[in-house]
Amino acid sequence: VSKPGYVANPLFTNLFPATSGNAVNGLGETEIRRPSPFFWHPVNMHEFGALQTEVINYHRRSPEISAEYSPTRPRGPKPIEKAAIPVDKAPSEWAEAVKSFALEHEGDLVGIAATDPLYVYDGYEIPHPWLIMIGVTMDYDNLSQVPPSFDNPTSAVEVARQYNRASRVCRELTNFILAQGWEAEALNGPFAKSLNMIPAAIAAGLGQLGKHGQMINRTYGSSFRLSAVATNMPLIADSPDDFGSDDFCTSCQVCSTACPPGAIFDTKQMVRGVEKWYVDFDKCIPYFGEALDCGICIAKCPYSRPGAAPRLAEKMLARRARKVSEGA
């Protein structure tokens, strides 16, 4: 339920097509399918192109935000030519090597997942069998200054800075892999490409899906951004990391209460054949547009407070263990 007094800005609502964004996302669908290209994809690939363009243009009215998304900002090198002969190493060695490289080149989190067609947007293909998922953390003091505004765009600028950093990590790693003679493609945000990053990052062990529709990591909470590298370098997949945040979200209402347009469901929804946490796009995006990226749900998440995520993970796992013990 939206907060009293909140009215969606017609600058954005007037650009909604007849189709609901929730329908495009598959809300209520019971059959498993690939995600459809949507917001942040090229505007000719979906019905929300005019709205997407207006949101971007509105955000770029902020000189500080516009500067961070300028082509002059460092986002990493262009791809090099792949070495002719691939270096032969065991998958375990390569897995360790790419993780070490990413962490030594501005990355904070890294995990590996096998490519699954369900991670790939309809109409796209990822020909490589492996996905290296990368996370970069955000500065909480900056992030916590939500919602951003033209007078104080600090939190939106922080998001843009970390997207740039995530881009540098994945592009540097791409060139490292190409130099070893293996194929590699950098997949970076904020604009969408072939990969739906959150499901892949969950599979790679970077965290769990939160009630706010974003990831929660056991160390950094929701205060991080993603990029990825797709490759045919022989690797080993990591396992998903279940540290109890899903149980926590079930009883927590911090993000859903804080959300001005009331876009966050308090219960899981059926989305493309999977029951999961979901955010109402049609309610979220007008406020996201007006609030210059918003970010309230991420900043207010109890897991995002510095030092809180490890303590909450320990608490939730201990609680789960007690329940198992009591039921034995």
What are these regions (language model features)?
Residues 92, 99, 108-322:
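Catalytic cores of enzyme domains
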